[in-house]
Every structure is written in C-alpha cells, then in structure tokens.
C-alpha cells in the first residue's frame, strides 16, 4: 500500500431527504445496474438502492463519496462536528449501516464521526484488489483536512484488524485505535505483525466465549508496545459491533471502556497536533 496520504476528491450532499446508495448487506456484492464501478465514480450518491435500515440514521449527517489513492469510490456518512473525531470501520458481513446508531451516540457526545464502506462493501465501488488500509487512510485524511485534527479509529472484527494495521501506517499517527474482536489476520492483512509499529494507544476487546477471538486479541495486544496497549476480555459470546449495539452487561462494560478511552485520548491536551494528513 502507498504510505503517502490519499488525495481526496469528494462530493457532499446534504442528507436531509437524501439517502445512501446502500443496503445493509452481509457480504460484498456488485453494485446495482447503473451504479459506478470504475475508478472514476460519479460525484455524488445515487438513489438506486436505498437501504431502509440506513435511511433514518444517514439523514442525520452528510452522505459522501470519497476517492482513495487507487481511485476507488468510498461511500461514507459524516455525523457531528468539531475538532475531535472517530472513524468507524465495519465488519465483513456488513456495511457502514451497522455503525450509524452508535455513530449518532458519539456525535451527540461531541465527536465528529465518519462511518464508511470499505471498497467492495456496501455502496463503495468493487475493486479488483481490496484496499483496506488505503480506505482507512482516506477516511482519516478527510476528517483532518476539514477541521478535525484529532482522530481515533474504531473497528469491528474485520474492521478491527484493518484499523490496527492502518493506525500503524498513518502519519502523523492517529490518537488511538480500538479493535473490537480483531482476528489476527483477515484477507492477508496481519494485525499482529503491524502492532509493534503502533505509535498510538490501542485498546483490544474480545469476548471469552466468542471462539478464539480472545486468543487473537491477546496475541495482538502482546505484540503492541507495552506502554501503548490495553486489553479487555469480557465474559460474553458477543462479537464486534454487538459490543456497542446490544443491551447486555458485557456491552455496557465495553461501551464504558470505549468512551473512557475516547475521553482520555481525544479530550486531553495532545502532545502534538497533526499538521497534515
């Protein structure tokens, strides 16, 4: 992946009355007939395939089309405003839709939130090769370029793995990364190998009854510099997005840890403020 920051070309439409070109799909699918699939996407969202689950939440923010360094069209929703931001990276069985309810919660707490579809998911374009880290780099650069210099990345499952790898690659470093149920490796991208290069605080979360995911989280945590890492293993079979979406004791414990992390690393005075992407 190129380590230079992706150049953004974007088009914004007010989302009051607008909708995303997406359904909350459970796997990457080809876009509907007429939707853009080339490296030169249309400048704004189409209304061809509206996801009913996304519609109410998406209208609370701005629907966007970002373009990453490879020229892929990345769908996103921008919620809230201000100088402290959160990028939300989805699971492999979903799209940005799954993050919007929690994104609204964070926006109401004063964070600017960007949820996006990885290339090949939701309503983003379908590439020949996935560009996970570039997609996250593009999302972070979007916020930094628009008055939100301090950013934490939160990822769920697949998105957690990609968030760790992207956080290790982005310069200047992001202010933190939270990985909910991260597999060590997904689609050839290895979070355990990237973790030693992290220069920001990291919180790893997993349920002890969620298969081997607690083992994975512990391995990535162990590979992270000791002064930057934190691990939370809860008694639960919950996975990824469920930790912030469900109403269970384990979810409450995780949400509290996530929001404490955000306060500690976004609301305190930074040692240095990023001056570029």
What do these predicted ranges mean?
Residues 105-123:
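Conserved alpha/beta-hydrolase
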Residues 25-28:
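Bacterial signal peptide processing site
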Residues 92-104, 216:
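The serine-hydrolase catalytic nucleophile loop
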Residues 127-146:
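Alpha/beta-hydrolase active-site loop
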Residues 198, 204-206:
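Short beta-strand/loop motif that positions the catalytic acidic residue
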Residues 224-242:
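Catalytic histidine neighborhood in serine/cysteine hydrolases
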Residues 41-79:
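N-terminal cap/lid segment of alpha/beta-hydrolase-fold proteins
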Residues 154-163:
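Gly/Ala-rich beta-loop-alpha elbow adjacent to hydrolase catalytic centers
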């Amino acid at each position: 992946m190129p380590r230079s920051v992706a150049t953004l070309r974007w088009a914004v439409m007010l989302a009051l009355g607008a909708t995303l070109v997406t359904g909350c799909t459970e796997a990457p699918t080809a876009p509907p007939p007429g939707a853009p699939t080339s490296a030169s996407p249309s400048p704004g969202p189409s209304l061809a395939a509206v996801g009913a689950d996304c519609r109410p939440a998406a209208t609370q923010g701005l629907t966007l089309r970002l373009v990453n360094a490879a020229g892929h069209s990345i769908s996103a929703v921008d919620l809230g405003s201000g100088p402290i931001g959160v990028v939300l990276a989805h699971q492999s069985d979903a799209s940005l839709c799954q993050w919007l309810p929690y994104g609204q919660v964070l926006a109401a707490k004063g964070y600017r939130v960007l949820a996006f579809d990885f290339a090949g998911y939701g309503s983003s374009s379908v590439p020949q090769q996935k560009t996970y880290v570039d997609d996250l780099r593009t999302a972070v650069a979007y916020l930094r370029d628009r008055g939100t210099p301090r950013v934490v990345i939160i990822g769920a499952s697949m998105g957690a793995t990609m968030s760790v790898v992207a956080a290790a690659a982005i310069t200047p470093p992001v202010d933190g990364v939270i990985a909910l149920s991260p597999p060590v490796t997904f689609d050839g991208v290895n979070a355990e190998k990237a973790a030693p290069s992290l220069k920001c605080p990291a919180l790893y979360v997993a349920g002890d009854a969620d298969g081997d995911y607690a083992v994975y989280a512990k391995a990535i945590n162990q590979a992270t510099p000791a002064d930057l890492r934190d691990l939370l293993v809860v008694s639960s079979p919950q996975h990824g997005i469920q930790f912030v979406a469900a109403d269970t004791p384990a979810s409450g414990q995780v949400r509290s840890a996530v929001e404490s992390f955000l306060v500690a690393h976004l609301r305190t005075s930074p040692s240095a403020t990023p001056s570029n992407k």
